UniProtKB/Swiss-Prot annotation:
InterPro entries from the UniProt entry: Collagen, Collagen/C1q_domain, EMI_domain
Cell compartments where the protein resides: Secreted, Extracellular space, Extracellular matrix
Annotated stretches, region: Disordered: 156-362, 390-441
GO biological process: positive regulation of cell-substrate adhesion
UniProt biased composition (Pro residues): 200-215, 231-243, 252-269, 306-327
Residues listed as glycosylation sites in the UniProt record: N70, N132
Record organism: Homo sapiens
PTM info: Hydroxylated on proline residues.
Gene: COL26A1
Stated name of the protein: Collagen alpha-1(XXVI) chain
Length: 441
């Protein structure tokens, strides 16, 4: 605790000793006028010097932003070139590649000097001196002088002691703590009847703790203007402007000089004609590059020229008669198999046939049915393997058409049970008996 109290006191004493050495800071009038300080010539001769001697330069470190080059970028720029001569023409568009630097925002530390109050002074004009060791010692001396005068006044006002040894009448003075303030005089009894003799002055007491922090000072003056930052990168190239109006046509130039005399003409019997020549104008002032045609009546006479180039081909002639038929070509490949047509409507139910003879037993009938089914299966397998030609049309009533239909159904729907296959392929016994009866008739 004592160390914490002594450290601020030691700092204050060091600052006061530095200020008490009488350091003076002479500044130019231009620097003071820049920050709004009064001129040294205004007022009395000593007032100007006293108003600026408490200002000092303080080094302040600031962080400012700046742009730093960070590589480069390639940009393709479109360039429009307008017409360089009057009249209608197309604008020329070209492209060029530009390499320009790129920038990024960076921060740097800048050290600048600012005018502020010197250590130990405050206020708007730095004329208020802070509490320091010098002022504290002056106040201590003044307090010691005042205490000595008070003691002299107390000794002069003290009454003489009585001649006899009788004790003075005692009164009931209020309780007073003499150990806390031994030399203090109570206000209730300013003149006691009997007091102890005044002893010698004691040593000065210890310095008390520092007082509370004072209120914040006034706002400082405005600092100097910062340095001008670097120039920013160039902006993008703007779009080309609109096409200008065509200029006025120039004045016609003066007539050219007469040409040289021509050759003498041929005889009157020679053919006559007109010669057209293109001669550029002699006027170069207006920059007109158009060609002017001049018609000169001249008599042509000379040998016939070379043969001209052949003319363009004529239109195609009429279509000729058809030629004889050619030899028959080779037989083509077999076409793809067509899709299966839709199933036809069921036929009309036939007439009821004669009843079959019941002489045959049931075992023989079942054996026949089994043999028939076996034969049909063999035929189906032959068709699947390709022994029989699938394009050949089977004869009606031979049983091959039924086997072929069963083969197609099996290919589309897969294998079916034997009973279902027998029911789809083979006719019933009644139909068989009807067929036998019709064959007998």
């Amino acid at each position: 605790m004592k160390l914490a109290l002594l450290l601020p006191w030691a700092c204050c004493c060091l600052c006061g000793s530095a200020l008490a050495t009488g350091f003076l800071y002479p500044f130019s009038a231009a620097a003071l006028q820049q920050h709004g300080y009064p001129e040294p010539g205004a007022g009395s001769p000593g007032s100007g010097y006293a108003s600026r001697r408490h200002w000092c330069h303080h080094t302040v470190t600031r962080t400012v932003s700046c742009q730093v080059q960070n590589g480069s970028e390639t940009v393709v720029q479109r360039v429009y070139q307008s017409c360089r001569w009057p009249g209608p023409c197309a604008n020329l568009v070209s492209y060029r590649t530009l390499i320009r630097p790129t920038y990024r925002v960076s921060y740097r530390t800048v050290t600048v000097l600012e005018w502020r109050c010197c250590p130990g002074f405050t206020g708007s004009n730095c004329d208020e001196e802070c509490m320091n060791c010098t002022r504290l010692s002056d106040m201590s001396e003044r307090l010691t002088t005042l205490e000595a005068k008070v003691l002299l006044l107390e000794a002069a006002e003290r009454p003489s002691s009585p001649d006899n040894d009788l004790p003075a009448p005692e009164s009931t003075p209020p309780t007073w703590n003499e150990d806390f303030l031994p030399d203090a005089i109570p206000l209730a009894h300013p003149v006691p009847r009997q007091r102890r003799p005044t002893g010698p002055a004691g040593p000065p007491g210890q310095t008390g703790p520092p007082g509370p922090a004072g209120p914040p000072g006034s706002k400082g003056d405005r600092g100097q203007t910062g340095e001008k930052g670097p120039a920013g990168p160039p902006g993008l190239l703007g779009p080309p402007g609109p096409r200008g109006l065509p200029g006025e046509m120039g004045r016609p130039g003066p007539p050219g000089p007469p040409g040289p005399a021509g050759n003498p003409g041929p005889s009157p019997n020679s053919p006559q004609g007109a010669l057209y020549s293109l001669q550029p104008p002699t006027d170069k002032d207006n920059g007109d590059s158009r060609l002017a045609s001049a018609i000169v009546d001249t008599v042509l006479a000379g040998v016939p020229g070379p043969r001209g180039p052949p003319g363009p081909p004529g239109p195609p002639g009429p279509r000729g008669p058809p030629g004889p038929p050619g030899t028959p070509g080779s037989q083509g490949l077999a076409g793809e198999r067509g899709t299966v047509g839709p199933s036809g409507e069921p036929g009309v139910k036939g007439e009821e046939g004669e009843k079959a003879a019941t002489a045959e037993g049931e075992g023989v009938q079942q054996l026949r049915e089994a043999l028939k089914i076996l034969a049909e299966r063999v035929l189906i397998l032959e068709h699947m393997i390709g022994i029989h030609d699938p394009l050949a049309s089977p004869e009606g009533g031979s049983g091959q058409d039924a086997a072929l239909r069963a083969n197609l159904k099996m290919k589309r729907g897969g294998a079916q049970p034997d009973g279902v296959l027998a029911a789809l392929l083979g006719p019933d016994p009644g139909q068989k008996s009807v067929d036998q009866a019709s064959s007998r008739k």
